[in-house]
Amino acid sequence: MTKDTLFSTPIAKLGDFTFDESVAEVFPDMIQRSIPGYANIITAIGMLASRFVTANSNVYDLGCSRGAATLSARRHINQPGVKIIGVDNSQPMVDRCRQHVSAYQSTIPVDIICDDIRHIEIENASMVILNFTLQFLPPEDRRSLLSKIYQGLQPNGILVLSEKFHFEDQNMNALLIDLHHQFKRANGYSELEVSQKRTALENVMRTDSIQAHKMRLAEVGFQQVELWFQCFNFGSMIAVK
């Protein structure tokens, strides 16, 4: 695993964060050291796939990056005729995802597509995964994507939505941000790395509150919505059609 040192030295002109070749190369290390509970979420996606994925249905991993969630789901699917569609708009991520997925043998076909997830049709889905993806979409586009996902899910189909959250209580929000930064420092990131990455993400990642997520999911039709995992200001929700 290549170590993430992208922000370890001062950058004179710090641009917006992008999922380019350099990020794709170090992504597994970056994500493990940056998102508390990430491995637990990936494991649980497999557990949820074993329960909710139905025969002859599709599974979508929207914003699939290097395929961790795709592979977790595929390992646990126990129904025939299932196809997994992974989508990411970063060609370097897609290239590595295809290599990663092809390294593991399975009878379940996986199609990895380089495209904007807003352009993908969701059809005959028993499971859709948005694992730290929605937060990178413009806020005005989030409801329409979730509505499309709801329409494309089978009855009793599931959406797994993992996100970084913000909190309306400013003191609690500040505490959880500080705890997250402490988590990153404990994983070997310097103050400079934490600061520069935060600045790079400011314009491209806009977080919602848990309440805002729940309200929007209910508005598009989901009957059952619950937060099933949280660590500091990161977490994952399940929404059942």
Curated annotation (Swiss-Prot):
Any Pfam family the entry gives: Methyltransf_25
Keyword hit for Membrane: no
Catalytic activity reported: prephenate + S-adenosyl-L-methionine = carboxy-S-adenosyl-L-methionine + 3-phenylpyruvate + H2O
EC number(s) stated in the UniProt entry for this protein: 2.1.3.-
GO molecular function: carboxyl- or carbamoyltransferase activity; S-adenosyl-L-methionine binding
Residues annotated as binding S-adenosyl-L-methionine: Y38, G63, C64, S65, D88, N89, D116, I117, N131, R198
Upper classification of the organism: Bacteria, Pseudomonadati, Pseudomonadota, Gammaproteobacteria, Pasteurellales
Source organism superkingdom: Bacteria
Subunit: Homodimer.
Name the UniProt record assigns to this protein: Carboxy-S-adenosyl-L-methionine synthase
PANTHER family: CARBOXY-S-ADENOSYL-L-METHIONINE SYNTHASE, TRANS-ACONITATE 2-METHYLTRANSFERASE-RELATED
GO process terms (BP): tRNA wobble uridine modification
Keywords, ordered alphabetically: S-adenosyl-L-methionine, Transferase
Assigned protein family: Belongs to the class I-like SAM-binding methyltransferase superfamily. Cx-SAM synthase family.
Gene3D superfamilies from the UniProt entry: Vaccinia Virus protein VP39
Its job: Catalyzes the conversion of S-adenosyl-L-methionine (SAM) to carboxy-S-adenosyl-L-methionine (Cx-SAM).
